[in-house]
Amino acid sequence: MKHISYARDKFIPTNEVNLNVIDNFLSIVRGYQVFTFLKTVNKGKPVFLDYHLDRVLGNAKSMNMIVRQSKEEIKSLVQDTLNQNRFDEIECNIMILLAGTSPIDSSALITDMPVDLFIIITPAKLYSSKSYERGISLGLFEYERPDGELKTPFTYFGGLKAQHAVVREANYDEALY
């Protein structure tokens, strides 16, 4: 099943969502982006959407990002994006990404441009029926983000490390970090 996402003011197939190094220089090279990640339940209903929007918009504000859309507009766009998808077989993951665009100074650190909004839809992980019978194994990985309130790609290093150390190398089903 192909999913539809929202990228830069239009709906497109998820596999066509991309960031251009020049257009999104601050996001790709400088890490000037924030995101939140949530799931759907009960045939496409987002879980804790208001909480996630408050968090991602609060993170954007703390990074002095210019966000063109209001919370209510983003909430509506999330629902519009979900409406582009089918939920008769599988639930989905939703990533709301605010990605920095082009710098305006020679240091390539400052911009007065609004961030690009992405609402990326991917399939949720499916567990086998045996997983529901026997349970799943959860491996622990100790990691403390430098800033516990701010969720950016560079603060997500612990998650990447946990997946490799706990899930891949220690053969757990999931990692808690």
Regions found by a protein language model. Name each.
Residues R68, N83-M95, S128:
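Short secondary-structure capping/junction motifs at helix and strand boundaries
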Residues A99-I104:
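Short, internal active-site loops enriched in acidic
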Residues C92-L98, A175-Y177:
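A short glycine-rich, hydrophobically flanked beta-strand micro-motif that places a catalytic Asp/Glu
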Residues M1-R68, E72-D80, S106-Y177:
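Helix-start/capping segments and mature chain N-termini
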